[in-house]
Design a protein with these regions (language model features):
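Short loop/turn segments that flank or connect secondary-structure elements
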Residues: 1-168
Length: 168
């Protein structure tokens, strides 16, 4: 597993992002059955990426919380739903409930989540590379949006691009 340097990751993604976004736009319009390729790409990326070496998602992004997430975490912290919401969360312009600020208040100094076992559903699924609805993720621009934050997403999209180069 390669050592991750966020600065070099950022430079790398900035060079590649326009081509990769164009690839994802093409992919969204294609009729290719993606799940088989996505499963293979997902297996391969975790041989090269260690999330704890990065935690950029927790430092630069915020999950979308479900009401169930908020109840579960609030109960764990000994707070009411409203107390937890008022202290840590806000509702954004899309009506999604998100963290009030970044980095995430649950990110430890060691890049580990201090509520890992009860973390939000969105965090559990991130970077969404092992989903059954890959086409939906491509069409909804999940990977396009995550590309500049997440080395695993970058590698996933690059692997898909390599696998599908002769099919698009």
């Amino acid at each position: 597993m390669r050592k991750l340097h966020i600065a070099s990751f950022t430079r790398s993604v900035n060079k590649k992002k326009y081509k990769l976004r164009a690839f994802l736009r093409k992919l969204a319009q294609s009729k290719i059955r993606l799940n088989r390729y996505a499963r293979q790409a997902d297996k391969e990326i975790w041989k090269e990426v260690n999330c704890l070496a990065c935690a950029n998602c927790c430092k630069k992004m915020t999950p979308t919380y479900t009401k169930r997430d908020i109840h579960r975490i609030a109960r764990h912290l000994g707070l009411t739903y409203q107390e937890y919401y008022d202290k840590y969360l806000r509702t954004d312009e899309n009506n999604d409930i998100i963290n009030r600020k970044t980095p995430c208040h649950f990110l430890g100094k060691d890049n580990k989540c201090i509520i890992y076992d009860i973390r939000p559903l969105d965090c559990r699924g991130f970077p969404h590379t092992n989903r059954k609805d890959i086409r939906y993720q491509v069409q909804e621009k999940t990977y396009t949006n995550n590309l500049t934050y997440c080395p695993a997403t970058l590698l996933f999209v690059e692997k898909l691009q390599q696998m599908l180069a002769d099919k698009l």
